Amino acid sequence: MRRRIAPALLLPFALLLAACTATSSADDSGGAGSNTDGKGDLTLRVGDQKGNDEAVLRAAGELDDLPYKIRWSTFTSGPPILEAVSAKAVDIGGVGNTPPVFAAAANSNIKVVAAKHGTADGETILVKKGSPLKKVADLKGKSVAVAQGSSAHYQLVASLAKAGLSIKDVKVTFLQPADALAAFTRDRVDAWAIWDPYTSQALRSAEARILTTGQGVVNGLNFQVANPSSLDDKKKAKAIGDYLKRLRRAQDWVYKHPEAWAKIWAKETGLPYEVALDSVKRTNGTRVYVAVDKDAIASEQKIADTFAKLKLIPRRFAFADYVDTRFNAGQPPSSTAPRSYGTATEKTEPTK
């Protein structure tokens, strides 16, 4: 008898609705999730997702001595955060590696100001444990679930290319993560291209195994993106610089306290603690803040060019035009290796 996923296990995925998906809905007002920290005359408006930057900063104690106010607005995913940044509804917000590409393609009013680099072990193509598929080349003619325009979509395209295939060689089924999990669990697709924490959840509850990871094909980057007018305001720019320093220290805290952060993250998102801890050790805690340098820009340009070729974005553009490097000082290069906790729940070498 095939094991089925109980509806309760699907709920956390609906709540998390991917930071790196370019087709997600959002609480555009941010009203219900809005709150304020700090003191002073200046207010920095920050776009966030549940269980992300605000939760990390609070857990690390980085919101205890703010010399300015932060007003938080909560969104369900990265794209609406960038819509808010572009519209001057927020000053800055954190997103994955794909939303800035789509926002820039739409000529949005944004500037990437900071980056963090993590392992790509959580960026995976999953198959069932009993699947006969052993390598990416075996996907030819098979069905693969993926969220359209997501980081996983790019990973699928790049992984297939590395194996000598094109996206036309597989049967792509565009599904958001919760729907993809259900389809994968019920054997309606042969494989699932996805990211953490969905990877960690599937490995624990869906009898999944990793066919390949994103190592060597995706850049493992996440970004902080600001509005240019906020950067032109000297006081706000100074606050943004301070905010980024706090994020860097908070990320260090996450790496040093994986269990403590996993408990908080699980409570924030509804994920089981074990899944949260797996994801922290596989992906979340491995991230280190790095410079938005030429290599980082080039890797994003590659994503943009790929999506333009697939006609997923309306135009080709120079990603460098949407970057502000003023906060790079003192940051290691984007090629800096992610941190590591050793082996997570399942670790496999990428297969070709």
Regions flagged by a language model, labelled:
Residues 21-24:
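Bacterial signal peptide processing site
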Residues 98, 178-269:
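Pocket-lining segment of extracytoplasmic ligand-binding domains
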Residues 54-60, 82, 86, 97-100, ...:
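Extracytoplasmic/secreted envelope proteins and their assembly/folding machinery
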Residues 305-352:
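Conserved C-terminal helix/tail region of periplasmic/extracytoplasmic solute-binding proteins
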Residues 233-314:
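Secondary-structure end/capping motifs
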Residues 27-166, 172-174, 190-194, 209, ...:
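Short, glycine-/small- and polar/acidic-enriched structural segments
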Residues 16-19:
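C-terminal motif of bacterial Sec signal peptides marking the signal peptidase cleavage site
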Residues 1-10:
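Bacterial N-terminal signal peptides that target proteins for export
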